[in-house]
Amino acid sequence: MPKNDLLLRSLRGEPIGRFPVWLMRQAGRYMPEYRKIRNRVKNFLELCKNVDLATEISLLPLKILGVDAIIIFSDILVPLEPLGVKVEFVEGEGPKLSWSGKVSDLKKYDPSQNAYVYEIIKRVKEAQDEVPVIGFAGAPFTLLSYLIEGGASKDFKSTKLFMWENPKEYKRLMDILTETVLAYLKEQIKAGADVVQIFDSWVNNLSLEDYGEYVYPYVNYLISELKDFSDTPVIYFFRGSSSFIDLAVDYRADALSVDWSVDIPELFKIYDKGFQGNLEPAVLYASEEVIEEKTLGLLRRIPVKTRYVFNLGHGLAPDMELEKVKYLVDLVKSFPLT
């Protein structure tokens, strides 16, 4: 058990003296220390696979920001490589994926091919016993979107057409990806992850009807299987939160990580659920006065006896100022629960 178990106690609904805080993409390009380490390797994927460097990066936010949890440094796309997908990160362009496009050509997932991820979890836990370690994976639909689009997309037209016009192939691919993510997260839990988070970054492009039909059954199965496997807390992050919240609360997730399209204090009035979030990241471009106003404005409205974790509604951006991120973390940590 980590010395600072605020995150775990909050997710379990136990008494806490203050709200726990960590940030998505808390170890990233906005940190000079990260950039120095990044320059020691040729590309981003190599960095993800270098256990020593990835461990060092994972630990940076604890040392520099004093966050209440460490999320391991990795990427949601790495479990696609064992399926036979070529994954590249092109500087200035982001991820590029290539495969035959035939679902039947995908290999059966072998978790051992992502052994470096599990080793990073072990190393981070060996290096510190201060805070919990969070493992993570991309959700099946978000991974499918990358596969069908060949990378990031503005409109996800190809994904939607594949989903609507090839329902049998869509189901086959989603089944494969769901079992892949399940096996991958089970290995992270076995390696010692104290919490796991599932990132559904692209579902905000779907209608409520399509989310219910094409996403919900797979996420529901995935989270249920994880909860049957272990009592390790599960957090589900999904963009477009206001559209899908009524469905997402039915998941067995310990907390839903939501974007700024919803009002968390209001959610606590309606649902008996844990929530994480949801300060709009753009607030960090503003002055410290605005950061304080927006942050305290949220925290003051959160009921004390609730399962709540402070985070952003999405990840930190590369051009954000480290000092403002530190100011935000200190602000949350200094907010007393009375």
Swiss-Prot record:
Pathway: Porphyrin-containing compound metabolism; protoporphyrin-IX biosynthesis; coproporphyrinogen-III from 5-aminolevulinate: step 4/4. GO terms for molecular function: uroporphyrinogen decarboxylase activity. It catalyses: uroporphyrinogen III + 4 H(+) = coproporphyrinogen III + 4 CO2. It is found in: Cytoplasm. Keywords: Cytoplasm, Decarboxylase, Lyase, Porphyrin biosynthesis. Its main location: cytoplasm. One of its GO terms (cellular component) is cytosol. This is Uroporphyrinogen decarboxylase. It comes from Aquifex aeolicus (strain VF5). The lineage of its organism: Bacteria, Pseudomonadati, Aquificota, Aquificia, Aquificales.
